[in-house]
């Protein structure tokens, strides 16, 4: 499976920017209560049905069933006009769907209304009113799509928080310091029982440019080694004694060059953004602290975007545009751990069986 993930990532060349979005969104409990509702049948077993329905309702309140987890991939290209872009986007869409089939992941393209609903739920996380929209109403009312998805207000007055309507939010970026990454990190982020949106903006680097870049770094490190050796000779001590950092960086750069040249690895520039929202400042701080604790556990640091909250918010919606210039270079295998599309959320409607509490 992991090899298929790597092949999936290697499909994207330098002309395609793609964004992976993982959205934890609180849903209305009334919706779930309607699904698990057991109607009386006017027979001798109605008492049992009532007791069973009461137990299900109690378990629903205990679990994390009110949290809906969604996963999206958004891709974008540069083109002179929409006529030129459309056939390219359709071809890329077809290739991505085929790659998902190889991974065993059911996927489908979203239509315009579904994309607008995602924006509506992102900008109005605590509003329980259902999203209602049709393109015919735009003609009758003179409104545009922004009027249907926007909250009552946006306020970006503070340094590291913002406000959408009655909701307070903050965008942070993940500083990846760990030498090795594990897929458990992303899984723990997505298990947080809070409103959270994780976005990964990924840009593939042209293979020749990546190899040339790493070669130049190796040359720079070798030049620094020679300078240190000259200093050692002039100072009268062993020229083989050089700073340990140079040996470490030199070895890592050579391994990276070998991976790019002979192990089917590509280089990707990754921006990892986290959007936390809550009703109060205290709840927001608690949610950010919980998220930062998971990052710290895996030797990464979650840092708030200072004076870039608006750009961070616009980069946290699935539109395929990244306004944050903070990027980390990762290889294919390091990036592949952020592709958890092989896990599937299960929710069975109709005549289903109760198994346990999640």
Residue ranges and their predicted role:
Residues 340-357:
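N-terminal pre-Walker A segment at the start of P-loop NTPase domains
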Residues 1-341:
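Extended, folded cores of ATP/NTP-driven motor/assembly subunits in large transport
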